[in-house]
Amino acid sequence: MEQTWRWYGPNDPVSLDDVRQAGATGVVTALHHIPNGEVWPVEEIKKRQAVLADKGLTWSVVESIPVHEDIKTHSGQFETWIANYQQSIRNLATCGIDTVCYNFMPILDWTRTDLEYQMPDGSRALRFDQIAFAAFELHILKRPSAEADYSAEEQQQALKWFEDASDADIEKLTRNIIAGLPGAEEGYTLDQFRARLAEYGDIDKNQLRENMAYFLRAIVPVAEACGLRLAVHPDDPPRPILGLPRIVSTIEDMQWLKETVDSINNGFTMCTGSYGVREDNDLVKMIEAFGDRIHFTHLRATCRENNPKTFHEAAHLGGDVNMVAVVDAILSEEQRRKHAGDMRPIPFRPDHGHQMLDDLRKKTNPGYSAIGRLKGMAEVRGVELALKMLKYPELL
């Protein structure tokens, strides 16, 4: 397993010196300054590679080349944006970068309601509160027919949340949901958000699948020609929200993706925190079923609460994810690949660490403070080493 670290570029509060000291050898990054849909020029890619190389690091995984909303809705200039995506893939491959993580979530990327959830030990975590989200949909956004997505009890609790909330609480919740979290390339005002939602009025799960299939049939052949691996990130949370369909949430979705364009270059990012929110997702089974297609891993854990649709980010070895079993399955796949002649380790990054210790007094990107991720990477590294010594000595 290759130890990597997500870095948001020159403005990231976590420096590349910090990344190197954490023990990572690879960096997961993107050219966030290039507008969605535009081609990533070779010169800009090489410029970023040079910055990393100066610190003894390599650009291991692109996360992400954003998929333009026109592509997801199959409207507007979608053909132009697809052609640009194809060229960006070619340019990355020209520079020796062979793995691209992306997602196909409508409008929003990953979604949370609380970015400073207090843990019992005093650290802060990210949280998705189903009731707060219902309050946003029903009483702030006022999405038509949203009531159908919530039980009568949830609607009552959401009304109480809204009635008890201050103006500051409402503004903060709204900002957390629609203003854009780290990695998201777009933020919205409420009116802009309502307009975006309206664009999906006639797009159900089957139509979104058709739109994604069109995209994949256009870009996977380019990836094959370039030797580049695509790794789709799952929906976060892995279920429909805001009346929007989600199509990368379950093992059935993974099977559909595999069959739609059956190519080793059409692969997956195994994000244990995203998939793991659903109790019916067996993470080890997913890795075993699609091991040859898993090109990148995000290792973190989440913990479901009394309302199973509410969850918070747990410690990396805690929560509802059996991280030891997950790492075991990844190492088993690495060993299989090694026997087949593929010596490349599967890159992993510690995802969404708690804000703790000295980082509590710093301005950080939510979920991406240094110390919490350092702790997570050290813990996963320990699990990996123990398993290698006990079960996979040839991987040492």
Swiss-Prot record:
Keywords: Iron, Lyase, Manganese. Pathway: Carbohydrate metabolism; pentose and glucuronate interconversion. Gene3D superfamilies: Divalent-metal-dependent TIM barrel enzymes (3.20.20.150). GO terms for biological process: D-glucuronate catabolic process. One of its GO terms (molecular function) is mannonate dehydratase activity. Its EC number is 4.2.1.8. Its cofactor is Fe(2+); Mn(2+). It catalyses: D-mannonate = 2-dehydro-3-deoxy-D-gluconate + H2O. It comes from the Bacteria. Pfam families: UxuA. InterPro entries: Man_deHydtase, Xyl_isomerase-like_sf. Belongs to the mannonate dehydratase family. Catalyzes the dehydration of D-mannonate. NCBIfam families: PRK03906.1, uxuA. This is Mannonate dehydratase. It comes from Enterobacter sp. (strain 638).
